[in-house]
UniProtKB/Swiss-Prot annotation:
Gene3D superfamilies: 2.10.25.140, 2.60.40.3510, Laminin. Residues 561-714 are cytoplasmic. It is a single-pass type I membrane protein. The lineage of its organism: Eukaryota, Metazoa, Chordata, Craniata, Vertebrata. The gene is Dll1. The modification Phosphoserine is found at residues 685, 688. One of its GO terms (cellular component) is plasma membrane. Transmembrane ligand protein of NOTCH1, NOTCH2 and NOTCH3 receptors that binds the extracellular domain (ECD) of Notch receptor in a cis and trans fashion manner. Following transinteraction, ligand cells produce mechanical force that depends of a clathrin-mediated endocytosis, requiring ligand ubiquitination, EPN1 interaction, and actin polymerisation; these events promote Notch receptor extracellular domain (NECD) transendocytosis and triggers Notch signaling through induction of cleavage, hyperphosphorylation, and nuclear accumulation of the intracellular domain of Notch receptors (NICD). InterPro entries: DSL (IPR001774), EGF-like_Ca-bd_dom (IPR001881), EGF-like_dom (IPR000742), EGF-type_Asp/Asn_hydroxyl_site (IPR000152), EGF_Ca-bd_CS (IPR018097), Growth_fac_rcpt_cys_sf (IPR009030), Notch_ligand_N (IPR011651). It comes from the Eukaryota. Residues 18-537 are extracellular. The chain crosses the membrane at residues 538-560. This is Delta-like protein 1. Residues 176-220 form the DSL domain. Ubiquitinated by MIB (MIB1 or MIB2), leading to its endocytosis and subsequent degradation. Ubiquitinated; promotes recycling back to the plasma membrane and confers a strong affinity for NOTCH1. Mono- and multi-ubiquitinated. Multi-ubiquitination of Lys-605 by MIB1 promotes both cis and trans-interaction with NOTCH1, as well as activation of Notch signaling. Ubiquitinated by NEURL1B.
């Protein structure tokens, strides 16, 4: 049980240590000695066709993990091998494959994991009667057994060992070497030299990668750029290169690219344009220091920048001009007086005075007032420092008052006036249209009201203009406008002026105010008649007849209208102008012989004590409609008459005030007698008041037109 636990632990340890590695444990069998030809049980090896006690020997090798007590039993965790028959009794084994093609010396046990450094080795020498029978399970075949534990480091050197059991000797050697491209103590370091896109390196003794010249990095995939190439702004695909990233330039990619179009600027980062001193603008193309860049001022002048591309030169004495390029002629203003000659110097002048004068500008005279130097009445006074001074009268100037002053030299006269020098004064002779001492006033040409017929005058220089009212023209608006001026007549008509109007004389075949209409051709007989005389008698007669017919028609219409109005005029009021009414019946109406059942007097409210009973006459309003229709006040009449009475009522209905009772009887009859309703029915409108009032009344308002109705509340 303990052996199995140890075996399982060894297997797990081997798996845990397994990594991507590769190595080989090599065992070289060198010599085996079995002098007596005995088996392990001391029996003689028999069988086969050979001599007696001749042991045909083959080997079983078992390599396993380190065990303190080595067990020859499987499993062989690191590998196992069974050789062919290698010899009889005692024999030596050469290197390579010389004895049997199936056997190679040394015996190799490949590893796919890290070499642990320790191992257990079991080598058994076995006897077989037949080369084809290499079974190892039969203990009767065992000649000898070697079991050992060892520590072994990786290396090319062989470890020699000899095992003696008393009757047999076994000399052997072993080592552990790494496969190609594997390095390290456990052959766990893989390194394969390469020179492609995945690396450029060789391998050292311990498997470290050694980069080829010009390459760097963990796998030697990064080329070493040109020495000095900027690490951030440059890169390379091959050793010794220096390729610039976007925005950078130069051999070492350490120069930023300026903004396109930048002239006088620099950059710290790509696409910048930081202007140098004296330059400005988006592209640094605007000169802000013109003086420094162009030095425009000459002759030692001082230059001052005043803005973009502008400057000012402060000239030294004796020079002038925009750039101080012109030398000033100090003699130009003739500083020397009294006939002295001027000599121009670099920044000054010198006066050479005539005889009798001295001073810087020859302003001093050697003469005195005793010599009478002043002319034209000038007053002389001696100067304390020598010389004299002439005080000139009006109109004269000069050192000796020898120059006459021209009073007109200052052009005092305005508006083209001529100046006349009068000695001590001057006179301005004005142009036509101007006045005043200096001819500064424009004469008002509208003062005399030259514009006629209400025209508006506008003054100008020595002239005027008139704005004429409608109907007049001309310079003074005195000429009436010709109505024929704009040719108002058409079709070859002749225009004739008639005061403020015009008349068109039309050509034959045209008519209208402006002869703009084409007239139809007249009958031939009218043409012949018209040709007999120059005056158009036919047209005049036809016009007169039409006018007469129109007047007769108007008169007939007026007569018809008056007759119609007289026919519908109402008769005179039989009751007089002022009556007292009760229940819409006047006094004269109540006296009629009409039997009417009237509501009790206690229930009657007289609201119409006096009223003017009148109607609107048809003569005043021909299309008059009654304001109130005939009203039935719930009066129940006892008609004692017969149908003749009804017909009589019908005949008297047109009478205004006298027919009110009859109309009421007719309506009552039509109400009581359903079968004797007249042919023309009259619609009625009934209005009833509230029963809560003191006076209960019912109004039956007929739609029939009645012009004599007075409202009465019952």
């Amino acid at each position: 049980m303990g052996r199995r636990s140890a075996l399982a632990l060894a297997v797990v340890s081997a798996l845990l240590c397994q990594v991507w590695s590769s190595g080989v444990f090599e065992l070289k069998l060198q010599e085996f000695v079995n002098k007596k030809g005995l088996l392990g049980n001391r029996n003689c090896c028999r069988g086969g066709s050979g001599p007696p006690c001749a042991c045909r020997t083959f080997f079983r090798v078992c390599l396993k993990h380190y065990q303190a007590s080595v067990s020859p039993e499987p499993p062989c965790t690191y590998g196992s091998a069974v050789t062919a028959v290698l010899g009889v009794d005692s024999f030596s084994l050469p290197d390579g494959a010389g004895i049997d093609p199936a056997f190679s010396n040394p015996i190799r046990f490949p590893f796919g994991f890290t070499w642990p450094g320790t191992f257990s080795l079991i080598i058994e020498a076995l006897h077989t009667d037949s080369p084809d029978d290499l079974a190892t399970e039969n203990p009767e075949r065992l000649i000898s057994r070697l079991t050992t534990q060892r520590h072994l480091t990786v290396g090319e050197e062989w470890s020699q060992d000899l095992h003696s059991s008393g009757r047999t000797d076994l000399r052997y050697s072993y080592r552990f070497v790494c496969d190609e491209h594997y390095y390290g103590e456990g052959c766990s370091v893989f390194c394969r030299p390469r020179d492609d896109a995945f690396g450029h390196f060789t391998c050292g003794e311990r498997g470290e990668k050694m980069c080829d010249p010009g390459w760097k990095g963990q796998y030697c995939t990064d080329p070493i750029c040109l020495p000095g190439c900027d690490d951030q702004h440059g890169y390379c695909d091959k050793p010794g290169e220096c390729k610039c990233r976007v925005g950078w330039q130069g051999r070492y990619c350490d120069e930023c690219i300026r903004y396109p179009g930048c002239l006088h600027g620099t950059c710290q980062q790509p696409w910048q344009c930081n202007c140098q001193e004296g330059w400005g603008g988006l592209f640094c193309n605007q000169d802000l220091n013109y003086c420094t860049h162009h030095k425009p001022c000459r002759n030692g002048a001082t230059c001052t920048n005043t803005g973009q591309g502008s400057y000012t030169c402060s000239c030294r004495p004796g020079y002038t001009g925009a750039n101080c390029e012109l030398e000033v002629d100090e003699c130009a203003p003739s500083p020397c007086r009294n006939g002295g000659s001027c000599t121009d110097l670099e920044d000054s002048y010198s006066c050479t005075c005539p005889p009798g004068f001295y001073g810087k500008v020859c302003e001093l005279s050697a003469m005195t007032c005793a010599d009478g130097p002043c002319f034209n009445g000038g007053r002389c006074s001696d100067n304390p420092d020598g010389g004299y001074t002439c005080h000139c009268p009006a109109g004269f100037s000069g050192f000796n008052c020898e120059k006459k002053i021209d009073l007109c030299s200052s052009s005092p006269c305005s508006n083209g006036a001529k100046c006349v020098d009068l000695g001590n004064s001057y006179l301005c002779r004005c142009q036509t249209g101007f006045s005043g001492r200096y001819c500064e006033d424009n004469v008002d040409d509208c003062a005399s009201s030259p514009c006629a017929n209400g025209g508006t005058c506008r003054d100008s220089v020595n002239d005027f203009s008139c704005t004429c009212p409608p109907g007049y023209t001309g310079r003074n608006c005195s000429a009436p406008v010709s109505r024929c001026e704009h040719a108002p007549c058409h079709n070859g008509a002749t225009c004739h002026q008639r005061g403020q109007r015009y008349m068109c004389e039309c050509a034959q075949g045209y008519g209208g105010a402006n002869c703009q209409f084409l007239l139809p051709e007249p009958p031939p007989d009218l043409i012949v008649a018209a040709q007999g005389g120059s005056f158009p008698w036919v047209a005049v007669c036809a016009g007169v007849v039409l006018v007469l017919l129109l007047l007769l028609g108007c008169a007939a219409v007026v007569v018809c209208v008056r007759l119609k109005l007289q026919k519908h005029q109402p008769p005179p009021d039989p009751c007089g102008g002022e009556t007292e009414t009760m229940n819409n019946l006047a006094n004269c109406q109540r006296e009629k012989d009409v039997s009417v059942s009237i509501i009790g007097a206690t229930q009657i409210k007289n609201t119409n004590k006096k009223a003017d009973f009148h109607g609107d006459h048809g003569a005043d309003k021909s299309s008059f409609k009654a304001r109130y229709p005939t009203v039935d006040y719930n009066l129940i009449r006892d008609l004692k008459g017969d149908e003749a009475t009804v017909r009589d009522a019908h005949s008297k209905r047109d009478t205004k005030c006298q027919s009110q009772g009859s109309v009421g009887e007719e309506k009552s009859t039509s109400t009581l007698r359903g079968g004797e309703v007249p042919d023309r029915k009259r619609p009625e409108s009934v209005y009833s008041t509230s029963k809560d009032t003191k006076y209960q009344s019912v109004y039956v308002l007929s739609a029939e037109k009645d012009e004599c109705v007075i409202a009465t509340e019952v």
